[in-house]
Amino acid sequence: MVSRAGLASLLGASFLLLLARSAEPLGFSHRPRTAGGELSAAPSRYLAREERWMSQRLDHFSSSDHRQFKQRYFEFLDYHDDPTGPVFLRICGESSCDGIPNDYLAVIAKKFGAAVVTPEHRYYGKSSPFDSLTTDNLRFLSSKQALFDLAVFRQYYQEKLNSRYNRSAGFDNPWFVFGVSYSGALSAWFRLKFPHLTCGSLASSGVVLAVYNFTDFDKQVGDSAGPECKAALQEITRLVDKQLLSDSHSVKALFGADSLKNDGDFLFLLADAAATTFQYGNPDALCSPLANAKKKGESLVETYAHFVKDYYIKKLGTTVSSYDQEYLKETTPDDSSSRLWWFQVCSEVAYFQVAPKNDSVRSAQIDTRYNLDLCKNVYGEGVYPDVFMTNLYYGGTSIAASKIVFTNGSQDPWRHASKQKSSEGMPSYIIKCSNCGHGTDLRGCPQLPFRIEGDSSNCTSPEAVNTVRKQIVKHIDLWLSQCHEPARAW
């Protein structure tokens, strides 16, 4: 999911999915090849980066609007030795899609001899239908339109394969879809809405539940931090809230964020910075300095300010401006991911990371009113997240589908918007370790910075990760084999 900083910071510097600003080893050892098929001297973080294009319909729900836009996608065929072998559709989410990541999906693809294809999400990166991102132009940005994009792309690429191998138009490779976070939700929803187009789905940290007041997010941040670190964060919040009343400019300048005039925007930045460490498996980066400062009697606020500037902003590439509502109002920003994702938040899924009434880590000023005011200020009247209708359409955590694997890291605040309990045909796994966060099954530990092939050796419990990975492969193997049966059991 995206953090305020925008998912571009994350997939670009990895993948920042915090809310509103806001896919491992099985014993396979190999040296990944480049997209051109040559063995590389050192593993790359991408399997493929060569851009390919297709024409996509702007509005799939209109019979009279025939406008189209160019959608970018990538393909990796090095492991696809059997033309009848599976195709893995890896879904890109709420950020620019600059290639196919060389994470644990690469290991799975090699095992199954799969082709890997990745289309970029409409509006993000280079797949935008419009030069100007006005609210009116954003009305075609939704998960529903994105799912039809995936269906059209799937059919387009299948026809492309059939033509390449001189096959009849009716031939169908077995397809399997993958996604992490919001794209994990899209993966599950694609299997729900288009079961005839895929043999199964992996929804890694798939946030399938639209949530209006997402208080469980902050509660999980506190739980993941542990008593000592949580208490330090709460003390920092109390002191910063107090300093904002007496000298807001000075305290914002301390964090390098004096450009943020809205106190809520500033407080959201501070909350995101803390949450990111647990979401992406780096708890010690935050909690160790705070514990040392507490022990030495040093300023917790100054220590946290150093962390925000050195880790969240400098190391992860977060920009302070992405938290500024005035920046979010820009219709032609240099990095549009934040404005785009916030529109999806404000119009469809909410995920409002508000402070719980009691024992909150984040400031109480980050409440429902703050989020609603942001939506109105940035996009105007009439943009409102109808989470009831979203959950009615997809089913939320009661999704009535089959052959979907749900996975979540135990420390990830986003897991409370995912399906955490298994049901018939939809196994769910919680990967338990102290640095198992967002997309651990595909990304390894920590989840940021990027780990080649989703290396799990730095997880506090590699076995916990690898056990779930074995289960994922087991389900993929079974469901792909059922796709090959004459009756093609869905």
Predicted regions and their residues:
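Glycine-rich "HGGG/HGxG" loop immediately N-terminal to the catalytic nucleophile
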Residues: 123-137, 152-155, 212, 441-442
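Alpha/beta-hydrolase fold nucleophile elbow
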Residues: 163-181
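Conserved alpha/beta-hydrolase
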Residues: 111-128
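Glycine-rich nucleophile elbow surrounding the catalytic serine of serine-hydrolase chemistry
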Residues: 179-189, 414
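A catalytic-pocket lid/entrance helix-loop region that shapes and gates access to the active site
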Residues: 196-299, 303
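Catalytic-loop region of hydrolases
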Residues: 2-115, 140, 474, 478-490
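C-terminal subdomain of alpha/beta-hydrolase-fold enzymes, centered on the catalytic histidine
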Residues: 265-490
